[in-house]
Amino acid sequence: MKRLKDAISKGEILFFGAWEGDALVGCCSITVGFSTFDYMPSGTFEDFFICPDFRHKGIARQLVQFAYKSSPISSMTVACAQCDIQMYKSLGFSIQLGSLFAFEP
């Protein structure tokens, strides 16, 4: 938990929310890293959720765009399950960068 708190306090993980009055109806985070490709900060989009009653109303797209524009990043990627690819494409993640593999020691 301390490592998470430290990362948040250093701005390495940024959290964003979508609100309807006092109710949190959506959230996401961006983990900030550094891209050696373009020598700029880059972000990994994570922790994405929209409450079921608020889906298909444009909130997800607004949240993604707000998070990107509010972050100090020049690019943003997301890793997702095959079943979520179309959703992320509809939200603006349109450049496929090959395949992602997780290392297992």
Feature names for model-found ranges:
Residues 1-15:
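Active-site rim helix/loop that mediates acceptor-substrate recognition in acyltransferases
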Residues 15-17, 23-32, 44, 49:
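Conserved beta-strand in the GNAT
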Residues 33, 51, 81:
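Residue-level recognition of the GNAT/N-acetyltransferase active site
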Residues 33-45, 55:
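A conserved beta-turn-beta hairpin within the catalytic core of GNAT-like acetyltransferases
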Residues 50, 56-69, 90:
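Conserved acetyl-CoA-binding loop-helix of GNAT-fold acetyltransferases
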Residues 70-81:
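Conserved GNAT acetyl-CoA-binding A-motif
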Residues 89-99:
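Conserved acetyl-CoA-binding loop of GNAT-fold acetyltransferases
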